[in-house]
Amino acid sequence: MARSGFEVQKVTVEALFLREIRTRFGKFRLGYLWAILEPSAHLLILLGILGYVMHRTMPDISFPVFLLNGLIPFFIFSSISKRSIGAIEANQGLFNYRPVKPIDTIIARALLETLIYVAVYILLMLIVWMTGEYFEITNFLQLVLTWSLLIILSCGVGLIFMVVGKTFPEMQKVLPILLKPLYFISCIMFPLHSIPKQYWSYLLWNPLVHVVELSREAVMPGYISEGVSLNYLAMFTLVTLFIGLALYRTREEAMLTS
């Protein structure tokens, strides 16, 4: 009995996922350690720089929990987007096998990055809790929906980056640079309400602001962020994914033959 297209893609993605693990980490455990050290180092540096100021301005909120729920979502978005750029070149030989498509490589990479950072998030939140910092998951459904939309959004941006990077090779070095400003305008280091309201309309165009603030609302009792919307995040995600899929559809054959 012939397999359906979905079953073929499922097997392909599973194989690519295992290949990504071997490529990313190899036989060494240092790769797994680095996945934990990178966000941990960011957390410690920002705690050292901003901890005292934030404790004065937000005395009732755990600053480590506040930071973690900004850093990890940004790392997920940044990592999936950037690792999608070279996905075709990294798997070029595999495309001789008909079932393997470029989009499968992005799905496999997105799954790996998601699993890594979700595990890191849980681990660091446990460490923060054991040090005496308080948090409570008050809206688990909101947290799951927000992060699910974040992953889909990242895949949509990844598709766009992959197509643009393959069509215009010189853009492969430019595209990661475009993500850098998002680190500073996505409310990672500061709450939205600390910005004057007249500037909110500009910041709220950024979907990552909604991801970060909704994540904080879900795990920090009493933290309420005006202006953010799960509906806006869902709409922005769907539009981005549609654009990514449309570009991929029109350029798939050209990318494989170029």
Swiss-Prot record:
PROSITE patterns: ABC_TM2. InterPro entries: ABC2_TM, ABC2_TM_bact-type, ABC_2_transport. Pfam families: ABC2_membrane (PF01061). The chain crosses the membrane at residues 31-54, 62-81, 109-132, 144-165, 175-195, 227-247. One of its GO terms (cellular component) is ATP-binding cassette (ABC) transporter complex. It is found in: Cell inner membrane. Residues 30-251 form the ABC transmembrane type-2 domain. Keywords: Cell inner membrane, Cell membrane, Membrane, Transmembrane, Transmembrane helix, Transport. One of its GO terms (biological process) is lipopolysaccharide transport. Belongs to the ABC-2 integral membrane protein family. KpsM and KpsT constitute a system for the transport of polysialic acid across the cytoplasmic membrane. This is Polysialic acid transport protein KpsM. It comes from Escherichia coli. The gene is kpsM.
